[in-house]
Amino acid sequence: MKTSEVKFFEAVKLFNEDFYWDAIEAFQDSLSDGLEDRYVDDCFLNIAVCYMSLKLFNEAEVYFLRAIDAGSTSGDQIDFEGPIFGKTSDRAYLGLARIALVKKEFADATNILEKLKGTESYIEINGEKISMYDICNEEVTRVKDILSK
């Protein structure tokens, strides 16, 4: 296994243990060491999720966009990670929609929602497969309802 892959998997471990700053650094190190293309979109996605967890939404947005771009370059294959099944780009779009909602940019959130329409990506919750589109649609609707009261 290459050094860059070892660093990537170490970063995943740090991420799973909620050591977000350390994970970001380790993910960036793996990229600097020439991480294989097939992991680059996941690496950017994980960095974005770390920033989201730290409530650094502008930084997260940058890395979600990089994940989408890297996925389009590498073929954006369907991944299976625990209860999540689907393309990295779909997960990144869901993240971007959540950022738009935090910023109260509802038109942007709705536009992003449309990009998830028809996707095969889903999250399995209590044995039920819920599409990324349905998750995003529910979140957009809920936030709009809360703020309209």
Residue ranges: model-predicted function:
Residues 1-2, 38, 87:
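Residue signature of alpha-solenoid helical repeat architecture, marking inter-repeat boundaries
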